[in-house]
A protein has these predicted regions:
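Key DNA-contact positions within bacterial/archaeal DNA-binding proteins
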Residues: 41
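…primarily DNA-binding HTH/wHTH and HhH modules…
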Residues: 45-68
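Short glycine-/small-residue-rich flexible loop motifs, especially phosphate/cofactor-binding loops
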Residues: 29, 44-45
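Terminal helix-turn-helix DNA-binding modules in bacterial transcription factors
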Residues: 1-38, 60-68
């Protein structure tokens, strides 16, 4: 069975958010809005469900992995 269109769009938004999160200077709320979420809270909930961590924790781990 395939992926529902809504789930596909969420996956694409989160993938784009991960790219943007690699830019440490961009606020999480700006990223949430730029990838199509109406609020940072909803973005964080969906991000954690799909990525396993909150956006802030994911960013910290990703950036630490690049430099550590």
């Amino acid at each position: 069975m395939g992926v529902r269109p809504h789930d596909y769009l969420l996956q694409r938004r989160i993938a784009r958010a991960k790219v943007l999160l690699m830019r440490a200077e961009t606020a999480v709320v700006e990223i949430a809005l730029s990838v199509g979420f109406q609020s940072q809270a909803h973005f964080s909930t969906v991000f954690k469900r799909l990525a396993g961590d909150s956006p802030s924790i994911w960013r910290r781990r990703a950036l630490d992995g690049m430099h550590g």
